[in-house]
Regions:
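N-terminal helix-turn-helix DNA-binding core of bacterial DNA-binding proteins
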Residues: 2-3, 7-46, 68-82, 86
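C-terminal structural segments of small proteins and small subunits
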Residues: 77-103
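Residues in the helix-turn-helix
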Residues: 49
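Short, charged, intrinsically disordered terminal tails
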Residues: 104-108
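Alpha-helical residues within the helix-turn-helix
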Residues: 41, 52, 58-59
Length: 108
């Protein structure tokens, strides 16, 4: 699957803009692949709701699924998170440069 973040980071940030999806990604942050059943522990969400949120994360390239026997397991895709971080770093640098120019103009 082509990583959606390569051309447009918006789907990544849209997927991250939900508290439930952030919590799911947090559970996967240790690098371990987990089943939907494992991810639904300690939550009031149904397995169907967890599945829906995981598919949004998967469509954004933030998680990958793999089959283990009859079970689907999901794991975080660190490279997509790294791409999102790199995008935010670029935007931050651009703002720093712009604010630096504005400061020089105002003080100059």
């Amino acid at each position: 699957m082509l990583n959606p973040s390569a051309a447009d980071p918006a789907p990544i940030f849209a997927a991250l803009g939900d508290r439930t999806r952030l919590a799911l990604l947090g559970k996967l942050a240790d690098g371990q692949a987990r089943s939907i059943s494992a991810l639904s522990l300690d939550t009031a969400l149904t397995r169907q709701a967890i599945t829906k949120h995981l598919h949004v994360l998967q469509d954004a390239g933030l998680v990958a699924s793999l089959r283990v026997g009859r079970e689907s397991r999901f794991a975080a895709r660190r490279e997509t998170l790294d791409e999102a971080r790199a995008y935010l770093d670029r935007v931050s640098r651009q703002w720093d440069e712009t604010l630096g120019r504005l400061k020089a103009f105002v003080e100059g």
